[in-house]
């Protein structure tokens, strides 16, 4: 679970390093879970990035530090919060994904992100 004003890592190769969550798209709540689409403000990026510092982008949450309870009773939790920047068609803007992603992304129809990820937990 990520709430408003949370700092998150960017887990793709668009050049952005960290972002701040400023809203959840399609929900009235101020909290986002894995697979939710959020709006982010880029806080830090490298100079040659395709996404510059200060821009507002759409992103999907791929990892959260809050525990995720699965239907089989298992609990999954990551070390930090991470997002992948997406375009208007919900495809990732980068060509690589860094780190593992949760299996819940497959149920939410983010197949391109799941296929690019090195590991799906």
From Swiss-Prot:
Q: Name one GO cellular component term.
A: cytosolic large ribosomal subunit
Note the SMART domains from the entry: Ribosomal_L14
GO annotation terms (biological process): translation
InterPro entries with a match to the protein in the record = Ribosomal_uL14, Ribosomal_uL14_bac-type, Ribosomal_uL14_CS, Ribosomal_uL14_sf
Q: Where are the transmembrane segments?
A: none
Assigned keywords, A-Z: Ribonucleoprotein, Ribosomal protein, RNA-binding, rRNA-binding
Q: What does this protein do?
A: Binds to 23S rRNA. Forms part of two intersubunit bridges in the 70S ribosome.
Q: Please identify the protein, giving its name as recorded.
A: Large ribosomal subunit protein uL14
Native source species: Akkermansia muciniphila (strain ATCC BAA-835 / DSM 22959 / JCM 33894 / BCRC 81048 / CCUG 64013 / CIP 107961 / Muc)
């Amino acid at each position: 679970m990520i709430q408003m004003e949370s700092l998150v890592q960017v887990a793709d190769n668009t050049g952005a390093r960290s972002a701040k969550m400023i809203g959840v798209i399609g929900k009235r709540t101020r909290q986002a879970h894995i697979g939710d689409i959020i709006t982010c403000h880029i806080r830090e990026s490298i100079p040659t990035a395709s996404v510059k510092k200060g821009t507002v982008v759409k992103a999907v949450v791929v990892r959260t530090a809050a525990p995720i309870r699965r239907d089989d009773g298992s609990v999954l939790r990551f070390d930090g919060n991470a997002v992948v920047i997406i375009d208007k068609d919900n495809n990732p803007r980068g060509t690589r994904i860094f780190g593992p992603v949760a299996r819940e992304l497959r149920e939410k129809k983010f197949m391109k992100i799941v296929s690019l990820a090195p590991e799906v937990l």
